[in-house]
Amino acid sequence: MKLVHVNEPRLEFFNGTHVCPRRGISAYGVYDRNSQTRRTNILLGAVGTNKDLEEFSNLLDRMSHPIHGASEDHKSNLFPDFCGFNSKAGFHSELVFNEDLGRKLRQLDIEKVVRIKDRVRRIDEAINLYYEEVKFLAQNRPVDVVVCVLPKAIFDAVSKDASAEGEEKLEESIEVRSEFNFRRALKAKAMHLGKPLQLLRTESLTSGGKGQQDDATKAWNLATALYYKAGATNPWRLEKNGGSSLSCALGIAFYRSRDKKTLNTSLAQVFDELGNGLILRGTLSPFS
């Protein structure tokens, strides 16, 4: 066996290049900083309990300032400081959220979902609970991204099998979990609304939770996702090499029909050199 080290590709930012997306944004700013079409104020809608919406607002306030990464010196390269999400550094944009952009979930409605014994129906009702609020925001508020905050009760309800279902075979259990994946199903149902979704667990909103990533890493992950999902934004791009032609990356999805009788293949996404993606749908093809 021969091992080959492949160098990290260099990424272009506003006024410099770097191999690390986070350090590149901090040092040189997002690639599209001078673009006339990018969002400088990203309007965020949010769906969650009253407490979760307050915690989400507090999180955005903390993210508007720099956040120190892991304290250990030997981990500084892995966990860099967060530059802050504001108009003066890094992303050169602001995340905007207020009470008018929030939709509160009633505890009574959450409890109704949690009490449903059938797992498939429980997930369907949880999807409907969030979908109706997402639809309101998409149709009545000028939001760029909608954040869905999942309290522990909802997360457990959609991610854990009931004890009565624990006797099924492992293969069948995997298929059920895959087919009725809450995250994918909610995003698929809301796709026609034209607003990207970002799902967060309640535990991600608070600082220093047990077993969680450090605060700077969480901020980097959320900030980058929100900036990219806001549309017409490109935090970085691959450095151009004059000696090689541009290429794109293809993602191919395989999935079975609900009756498990047919296998469908779809060209899922095509990305250009800027990272912009097009979603394509393939047609049914015979297979043996």
Predicted regions mapped to residue ranges:
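Long, low-complexity, intrinsically disordered terminal regions
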Residues: 1-288
